[in-house]
Amino acid sequence: MLIPLGLSASSPAVPERPVDDTAPLENQEIPVTEKNTYPYVDIHGDYRWLWGRGQFRADSRTAPDKVRRHDERIYLTTRRLRLFPFIHFSEKTSLRTQLEDLRNDKDANADHHLYLGRLYVQHEQARLKVEAGRFNYYLLDGNVIDKKVDGLRLRLGERTTGPGSLTFFAGRTTGSDDRHRLRGWSLLYSSQHGRLKSDAAYLDFRRLQDLPSSRPSLIGQSRAGTGFDEQRIAEWRLMYELTPKLTASLDLLHAWGRHDADGYDTTDSGFVAALTYGHLDERQKGSYEAWIRYYDQPSASILYHTMDGDTTFFRRMGFCGWGARLDYIVQPGLAWAVEGFSLKNRHHTAWTGAFRETVIGTSLTAYF
């Protein structure tokens, strides 16, 4: 993830592999071989090399007739090893863990040597799925949250049968301290009618420790400040399969956010529109998937965005712009991806002018 060191309000954690099958391949669990005798242990994993470049530009007004420009270029090269030891107690119940080792070639202080990043129990049967412990919470396309959490997630029903499925989550996000942790709950309803999929979600989260006042204090009352102590977000995603290979989706967002020390609150709406082409199969050489998205997203609608960029760069101004990604299977078990974003701030303030962020990155991931 590319983050401007001098401009970022916070440092988002490295995204982990979500459980939602709409996530990029490198963030999905690869199917494992089932056995007939229990218990048994299964271990799979991946190794990823990633390179990225980000260009960040911000204009600030020090006086009505004076504009100061800050330009920063960031390069990133990382190597990541992940192991997923699963203990299967029965066909329906398992203990799932993740070990991760991350090396940053540009900044050794950002290295994370082998550690236990995930530990949870999963029980799944017809029309019921329960997860409890530390796992990754990836909601829909990750426009609102893609983050490691400690908590409970319960799903009742199936999207494709009957009235659909209802998923409840309660818990808190992980972080270095209470100012970087959120506690809350969410509810997700999913259904499918032929080629049309519909998902409606509501999230209510609060920071464990309130953020301090934005500095300088003069900007605290505006969108030029940073962060929220409380956020409530409503999300509705419609996805339609135009052809077997082409899918269109529209993600509608409405959010409220408050920063207590700044005495600031906002209610805002936005959307993310996307087209996806192709179907990715890690077992089939030459398979691919490509998407393009247009973002018009308020900052209050973001808890932890999945994109490989820094949405906190835009403070409370929100952002709009384009993103695109291509995933390609070089050979079974080896995937190549390239991704890019061109974004700008959604609003200006009396203290800030144009903010622009351009990010491009590529990765090679081997699965085993």
Predicted segments with their positions:
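Outer membrane beta-barrel
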Residues: 75-203, 267, 271-304
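Outer-membrane beta-barrel pore domains
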Residues: 14-26, 30-73, 108-109, 122-126, ...
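Boundary at the C-terminal end of the N-terminal hydrophobic targeting segment
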Residues: 7-15
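Bacterial N-terminal signal peptides
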Residues: 1-6
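Short secondary-structure boundary segments
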Residues: 134-163, 212-243
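Flexible, surface-exposed loop/gating regions in the mature catalytic domains
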Residues: 207-209
